[in-house]
């Protein structure tokens, strides 16, 4: 499985599942559990139980969202739906795609922050001093150059829950390479398994001249990793309540792909499921129809309370 680049972007040769599982380049694909590196690195006394009496489970929890596109924003959308104060930061020079931002921006606030600017960087560090959770979704090394590695964050605030995600894992030679769902699907053998031959109408690997690679019908690695990140954040917060210590969870699209391959294949008939609960909210993007979160709190459906805000409309401050 060769690593090549085009205009600075990584490309992957289409891989089969055996090649993916035996390839040493993606060191993080098989490292530890789905959320690796979850050992507690901070220190402190048990936290007081101030959240339980609030309306939602994560009310009063402050989350700094340093993520983009799908996986990370899905994670912080879950945390926001559970009541956390989520402030998403984006670089002014690289605006997010409107559709992705609107889809994952419910219940959050949005601000722009140029970490290369000394004044802005200092303000972000002030926010970090009172944050409970940081979710970071940039490639390896991107935030480290601004002094925002998980180790530095925990040293500055020992009770912090830090969740990081990237494309190719946190060890190995690809740890600092950009990775996206579709590319990881191809490299992991998913595109090979889901390939089709129009002439035979058969799915699966096929050497015929009309065979074409396929893909999952959704960005499954992104969404699965996002929900995994949210679960990791909640787990770290739960540990902090009893120990006072923060910690780090590291996830990646590659590790999620490996997790999917480890699950048994099910050939049973797919059962019909009920349509998800849909709602509508007015927003600066127009009227939005959306699926409510797949979350239940004390037997009640968790619903989004606020539409996505205008992009970059919030102050660099907690609510």
For each predicted feature, which ranges?
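Short, glycine/charged-enriched secondary-structure capping and boundary segments
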Residues: 77-80, 101-103, 148-151, 176-180, ...
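Acyl-CoA thioester-binding alpha/beta core of soluble enzymes
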Residues: 1-93, 121, 125-133, 152-169, ...
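Short beta-alpha connecting loops at secondary-structure transitions
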Residues: 108, 215-218
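Rossmann-like NAD(P)-binding element
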Residues: 108-144
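Hydrophobic alpha-helical scaffolding
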Residues: 114, 133, 173, 177-180, ...
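PLP-dependent aminotransferase-like
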Residues: 78-116
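N-terminal Rossmann-like NAD(P) cofactor-binding subdomain of oxidoreductases
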Residues: 117, 136-195
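Short, solvent-exposed loop/turn segments at the edges of secondary structure
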Residues: 99, 105-108, 157, 177-179, ...
């Amino acid at each position: 499985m060769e690593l090549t680049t085009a205009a600075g972007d990584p490309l992957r040769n289409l891989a089969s599942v055996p090649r993916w599982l035996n390839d040493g380049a993606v060191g993080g694909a098989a490292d530890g559990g789905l959320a690796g590196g979850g050992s507690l690195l901070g220190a402190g006394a048990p936290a007081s139980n101030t959240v339980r009496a609030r309306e939602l489970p994560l009310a009063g929890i402050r989350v700094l969202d340093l993520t983009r596109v799908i996986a990370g924003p899905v994670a912080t959308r879950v945390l926001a739906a559970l009541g956390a104060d989520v402030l998403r930061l984006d670089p002014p020079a690289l605006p997010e795609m409107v559709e992705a931002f609107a889809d994952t921006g419910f219940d959050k606030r949005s601000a722009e922050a140029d970490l290369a600017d000394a004044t802005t960087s200092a303000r972000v560090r002030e926010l970090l001093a009172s944050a409970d959770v940081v979710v970071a979704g940039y490639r390896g090394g991107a935030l480290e150059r601004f002094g925002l590695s998980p180790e530095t964050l925990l040293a500055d605030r020992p009770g912090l829950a830090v969740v990081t995600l990237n494309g190719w894992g946190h060890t190995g030679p690809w740890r600092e390479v950009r990775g996206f769902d579709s590319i990881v699907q191809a490299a992991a053998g998913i595109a090979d398994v889901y390939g089709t031959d129009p002439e035979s109408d058969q799915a699966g690997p096929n050497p015929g001249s009309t065979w074409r690679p396929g893909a999952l019908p959704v960005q499954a690695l992104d969404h699965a990793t996002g929900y995994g990140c949210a679960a990791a954040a909640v787990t770290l917060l739960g540990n902090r309540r009893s120990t006072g210590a923060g910690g780090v969870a590291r996830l990646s699209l590659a590790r999620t792909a490996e997790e999917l391959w480890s699950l048994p294949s099910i050939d049973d008939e797919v059962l019909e499921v009920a349509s998800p609960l849909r709602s509508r909210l007015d927003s600066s993007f127009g009227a939005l129809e959306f699926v409510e979160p797949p979350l239940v709190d004390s037997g009640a459906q968790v619903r989004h309370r606020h539409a996505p805000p205008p992009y970059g409309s919030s102050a660099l401050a907690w609510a």
